[in-house]
Amino acid sequence: METRAHPPGLQDVLQFPLVEALYGRRARRFSLGASIPDGPLEFTSRHEPIPLSDLEQMLVLTAAAGNTGWHYMITRHARYAPHLSNYSGAAGGRTFPSAAGFHTSEVFFTDDEGTYLFETRDAPALVDQTADGPPDLDAVLEAHRSRIRKLSESRLHIPAEEPYMEGHNSWCANRPGSTLLIPVGDLAQHMIAVLCFMVQNGYALYDDINGDQISGLERYSHLVNLEEPLPLSFMETYAITECTAELSTCCYAGMLMLQAMGLGGWMFDGIDRYTVLGASGDPEVPWLGFRYDTDERWPLPNPTGLEGVFEGYCPPYYPDMRAAVEAFADRKFGPGGPFHPDTPGPWKESTRVRSSAQVHSEEFKECVAIMAQYIYERFGKFPGTVPSIFVLTYLQAHHLELEFYDHHFGPGAYLKTHADHMSRWHPERCEG
């Protein structure tokens, strides 16, 4: 691979051992320009913050949520063989896993210059995987750069105090010079995917919270087992757990890249997620500005989406849950979807493989929609017991203040990549 006009640190990244990233991973929070004013680790940096370069930022973003080619999909289930298993929501794979290939999340990020959306959820293969070696990194980064959508001209503002962020992060999170990644999950869409999975495997739902069966499912007893339905609370816990794994492994993948690059940073969950989405109730702290609703039945506000940017698969962005289910089916089986015959793929006969998946029938979608609409009407939102839009983990990347670690720690507090970062990535700052 040619590394045209790139700093020598890029070649270090390409040769960095995975084992060293795994065992060298640490939360390194102290950035250039930071200060701890008191206590046993008191220290104030002598240096100004240095923002990530475009190349540094793109490497972190593509490590956290980059497209890695075509998803191979789940290949067989005896229940509907010889049809291809048709769970997946996306045709492309990313650097992190998603339950059954649902892929319902996207990554927002903010830096000194603005706030952005990094859209890779439904991207086609941006990486040309061949038997000849790794793909051309310049081409990969350029393809991913085109997936960035700028939403504002400034860093997201959040007061460095409780209740907006946990007190132990108030001195280090979202600081000048940092890039903060915010994976956001469409839990409404994820729950639709879970309901489809249930019907595909013969399971029905019942409302264990209110002690009710779901009226109308009796018409679909040939599709689902009404004698042994699964509890709503369990299945919504199932959905949020799967979504959490997606958001967290996204951050973890980016965290490994920080070690290879010699950047500081850490993955954490210590910023209030309702504040992040814009549901803090404080008009002075709009953050991402998602729509949210309140209801006396809910202990917390419920974010549903950011219009035209990231809209949840639920009202008000769809008139009802039947329309949301239809939209999810179109994502799967429509143009560009994993089960559309014209979508390219990794197989020698991709059209034959993709078209072998059984398309959701009208009665299948009706069965899913009856359960989804019941939840929406009974609880006033969808899903009923968990948020429609979900945020949990974040990843921050910044330039490390080595003097803090040299002052307070013994040898080995940071990796050689950290020690050499400025000379290998920013040699102009080391001159003179």
Predicted regions located by residue number:
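Acidic, surface-exposed loops and disordered segments
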Residues: 1-432
